[in-house]
Amino acid sequence: MEQLTKNQAVATSQEAFQNQNEPQLRDENVHNDKSVHGVLNPTYQAGLRRDAVQPDIEAERKKRDEIEAGKSYCSRRFGGATCDDKSAQIYARFDKNDWRIQPAEFYRFHDAEVNTFGYF
């Protein structure tokens, strides 16, 4: 009887040694916060979506703030004139303390003659 248990112990230790060299398979019964039976936990999914959307929201907010700053700059610089969003975004990037004339390539011309013949 004792011999049988000794042989079983040796066999068990040999199996354990062999199993160390084999890749470990994921135990489907183990639960963690991220998944249960291969389905992502809704709380974890919400976190993933929020992390993916957050940079987009921040970029949109930065763009909107830049446009508002540019419109304010246009209004002050050009005596109350309003700008479209694209021009306002360009003007927002100008140095507000630099009052030298800006290169013409930064201005948007809506005049068909200027656009057709390309004076600038």
UniProtKB/Swiss-Prot annotation:
Region (Disordered): 1-64
Membrane-traversing stretches: none
InterPro entries in the cross-refs: Phage_B (IPR003513), Phage_B_sf (IPR038149)
The EC number(s) this enzyme carries: 3.4.-.-
Keyword Protease: yes
Swiss-Prot/TrEMBL site (Cleavage) positions: 76-78, 93-94, 108-109
GO BP term, pick one: viral capsid assembly
Superkingdom, taxonomy of origin: Viruses
Modification(s) after translation: The proteolytic cleavage of the internal scaffolding protein B releases the scaffold protein in order to continue virion assembly.
A GO MF term: peptidase activity
Compositionally skewed regions (Polar residues) per UniProt: 1-23
Composition-biased stretches (Basic and acidic residues): 24-36, 48-64
Gene Ontology CC: one annotated term: host cell cytoplasm
Keyword Hydrolase attributed: yes
Subunit-structure text: Component of the procapsid complex composed of 60 copies of the internally located B, 240 copies of the external scaffolding protein D, 60 copies of each of the viral structural proteins F and G proteins, and 12 copies of H.
Family membership noted in the UniProt record: Belongs to the microviridae B protein family.
Functional note: Participates in the assembly of the viral procapsid in the cytoplasm. Forms first a 12S pre-assembly complex with protein H, and F and G pentamers, then twelve 12S complexes are joined by the D protein to form the procapsid. Internal scaffold protein B is released from the procapsid upon genome packaging. Autoproteolytic activity cleaves protein B and probably facilitates its removal through the pores of the procapsid.
Protein name: Internal scaffolding protein B
Organism: Enterobacteria phage S13 (Bacteriophage S13)
